[in-house]
Amino acid sequence: MHRLNHDLNTRHQASRQGGNMGNDMQTTHKLRNRSLLAAACAAAIAAAMNPAYAQDNTPAVEEIQVISSSRRPENLTDVNAAIAILSEEELRLISHTHIQESANRLPGVNINRNNGQESLISIRSPVLSGGGACGAFLLAEQGIPLRAAGFCNVNELFDSHSENAERIEVVRGPASAFYGSNAVHGMINVVLPRAGSGSDVTVEVGPRGTMRGNARIGFDEGRVKHSLLLNGISEEGFRAESGYDQQKATWLYETTLDNGVNLDGGIGITNLNQETAGYVVGLDSYKDETLRRTNPNPEAYRNNNTVRAWTRISFTLDSGWDVILTPYYRKADLDFIQHFLPGTPTELNQHNSAGMQFATYKNLDDNRLLSAGMDIEFTEGSLQQSQALPTTGSPFVAATVPQGKHYDYDVDASQIAPFVQYQQYWDNGFDITLGMRFERIEYDYTNNMLVGRTRDDGSVCPMGGCRYNRPADRSDTFGNVAPKLGIRYQLSDDHNVQFRVTRGFRAPQATELYRLQNNQTVADLDAVEIDSIELGLQGSQGALSYEAIVYYMDKDNEIITDSNRINLNNMHTRHKGLELTAAFDINDQLRLSGAYNHARHTYENDQISGGVNLNGNDVSSAPRNFGTAQLQWRPTSRLMTELQWVAMGEYYSNPENLNSYDGHNVLNLRTRWDATEDLTVSLNILNLTDRKYAERADWSAFGGDRYFPGEPLRAFLALNWAF
């Protein structure tokens, strides 16, 4: 039977391929870091060739189920996709206060933690920033996107209840036909526990007065099952005026009616009140012990609250078709100061949306499965941006970024997307997956201010006009078709090879279409499209499990933000890489696992930014090498300790490739002790060597090198009581 060990069961992993760094990006210790990280994976592979350590207690991959491919549980062995999984056991060990702490151990994933609960995401991509950059990733909970199509937010992962997740699934590369707009570079899906599944309470204390409580309370009333998930945290922050309070609550239910119809769903509420610390400015300022703790933007804040409700209705027709209907509702309100922009304007945005996911499945025979469905969604959204004080800085910036209101608009949007997928399996070891999705998104925009690039009173800014430009009322429609092809061949019971050709797309986000700048009067944007081809090898031998994937992606109509915070349209970028992962049980007590990523992300068309032609340059915030390695020691059945190495390679911090960040290495130590059957004690020590590093490095034309400093050495002590 095809078996993978637990670390690879819980994630289908990989590593990236790319070109060599430029001469200025090839210092000796960076090459050493890359070699050491690759060696961690190679050591597991080489060691596993010794059968003396082979173990029979590794879970079968057939036992692992995922929902991120077809929206219903299916065995991982039946899915031809690059899916990585964080299991409940791993999530409990990590016990993240920010989802980055968990997700970044998966292949292809590189989430930058900015400040507080903020983040910028990378999945087989650069770390993308800008108002619509979030459109490159589909972020979901229970398979339902966290935000409406066209209304994403770069930080929206804090909307998910990941702290109480049963598992987190990550699809690398364009997702299946079941998912459309935003599933360009990948998808993160937070899967919550089944209703009624167990009860426990966790209390945690940490540095600087950090307090966190987490609870899962299950009720099994026979036919009806309920669960209440709760999470709350209060943290002061290690930088000045950078604390936050966050609360999350989710109610889940499940029942089966007399006619056999199954209902499961829930209601989720989140609230975040955050004091935000901005970038520290100046070359290597993150290394300065005093400066790294300061906050240049003490006025900055972020208030976010969301409500989501859904019900999944599943039944089987007499004709043999399985049907799943999932109506849902979401509401999101966000109020924050844009400390990263000149003048630090305040933005208020909100949207209400309702939709329906419809999918049907039919086993045509033992070897063929046909699936089809449709997604429908309607959204009402709005955005206001205003600036309370005059802009400081250069005379040009002060003249062109006015005090007062910049934008005020409403957008109504609709989405409709039919899809079909066909799967066939042959006895000779081959199987094929064919899919197709068509998606149409329409925006109806209403401007509530004066049209054009004037101040809010109609007066003209000197030096060529105001930075912000408001288009007249208009409607925009985008339609896209995305074909999918996957072929897999079982080389033996324990090894298989996979080949995939897919297309991903996203419509421009509302903020990209209607927050115009400078001379733009109409955002002449097309949908972003990416064509992906990948080849993977996956399997196990004895105590080893492994996966290797090479990929090549070509993206057109990309929208990027340059160092002046100006959108550059119609960009062409290329993304190629290698993802490697391995996990090896050295003996009954020790396990070594790791994921290594090597990638090259480049601009592929002529575009002048800062006087430099970007063609051939690395995309900014795109490390060519990064990954993690974990060594777990389990001396007894009740005690487990994990030492984690997080390695980040160097990368350019601007599109012009004139500034860069050296990268870093960070060690984390996590220990979990089952004191009794019901009581567990955990101690997590992060940044074990107190390394001074940057969570994110950036370069801005308004201030030069700037950084979000990484947090210093810190420890969290937790008690968990199961009942």
Question: How would you name each of these model-derived features?
Answer:
Residues 144-172, 191-192:
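Short acidic/polar hinge/loop motifs at secondary-structure boundaries
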Residues 214, 223-225, 320-338, 490, ...:
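Membrane-embedded beta-barrel scaffold of Gram-negative outer-membrane proteins
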